[in-house]
Amino acid sequence: MIQPQSRLKVADNTGAKEVMCIRVLGGSNRKFANIGDVIVCSVKDATPGGVVKKGDVVKAVIVRTRKGVRREDGTYIRFDDNAAVLIREDGTPRGTRIFGPVARELRDKDFMKIVSLAPEVL
């Protein structure tokens, strides 16, 4: 569960290393976001010469959470960290590579480009 002020790792090569959630999209009173949800973030740590810089406000989709998510068959999938991938307004990823595993739930939320770039889909 990601909420405003939560910090997440960035799992792509846009140059951002860490972002902080500032808004959960999808309703005026929505408090939490899970895997596959879109959030508005502020870049808190970035590498020099990247696509984004520190202080930029960007949209991101959550690809891994410590909380995990329940699947249809009753199993749970959990990860070791909270991670997001930066996206454009049309939902395509801003980077050209994805690092680490991503959850299969992204396929249901129509983030097929992220799923195809990911090295492992769990």
Curated annotation (Swiss-Prot):
One of its GO terms (molecular function) is structural constituent of ribosome. One of its GO terms (cellular component) is cytosolic large ribosomal subunit. It comes from the Bacteria. Keywords: Ribonucleoprotein, Ribosomal protein, RNA-binding, rRNA-binding. GO terms for biological process: translation. InterPro entries: Ribosomal_uL14, Ribosomal_uL14_bac-type, Ribosomal_uL14_CS, Ribosomal_uL14_sf. It holds the Pfam family Ribosomal_L14. SUPFAM superfamilies: Ribosomal protein L14 (SSF50193). Belongs to the universal ribosomal protein uL14 family. NCBIfam families: rplN_bact. Part of the 50S ribosomal subunit. Forms a cluster with proteins L3 and L19. In the 70S ribosome, L14 and L19 interact and together make contacts with the 16S rRNA in bridges B5 and B8. Binds to 23S rRNA. Forms part of two intersubunit bridges in the 70S ribosome. This is Large ribosomal subunit protein uL14.
